Amino acid sequence: MNNSKDNPFRGAIARKARIYLREGLDCVYFLNKAGQAEPCPACTSLVFQGKTCEEHIHNNNLLSWQAVKQLEKQTPQRQSLN
């Protein structure tokens, strides 16, 4: 599954992501460089195969559902104009 060039934590990240999806997340989220939760639909489908997408192959900043919810609360929501 992992070759020597891969992140050695890639399988563990995928296992953790599967748990977070079972706990209520609709998508796998990583922390981006701006400190925001960034969804990754590609990783969401790959974690059930024990993998992450190429973009996140070296990113260990997987966010739990609690962290995603907390970041959503801290980020001001746009008000829709009616």
From Swiss-Prot:
Protein's GO biological process: symbiont-mediated suppression of host gene expression; symbiont-mediated suppression of host innate immune response
Result of mutating L81S? In strain: Isolate Vero cell-adapted and Isolate Vero cell-adapted p65
Alphabetized InterPro entries for the sequence: Acc_prot_5b_avian_CoV
Q: Name one Pfam family in it.
A: Acc5b_avian_CoV
What keywords are assigned to this protein?
Eukaryotic host gene expression shutoff by virus, Host gene expression shutoff by virus, Host-virus interaction, Inhibition of host innate immune response by virus, Interferon antiviral system evasion, Viral immunoevasion
Q: Which domain of life is it from?
A: Viruses
Is-annotated flag, keyword Acetylation? no
Disulphide bridges: none
* Known role: Involved in host translation shutoff without degradating host RNA. By suppressing host gene expression, facilitates the evasion from host type I interferon immune response.
Q: What name goes with this protein?
A: Host translation inhibitor 5b
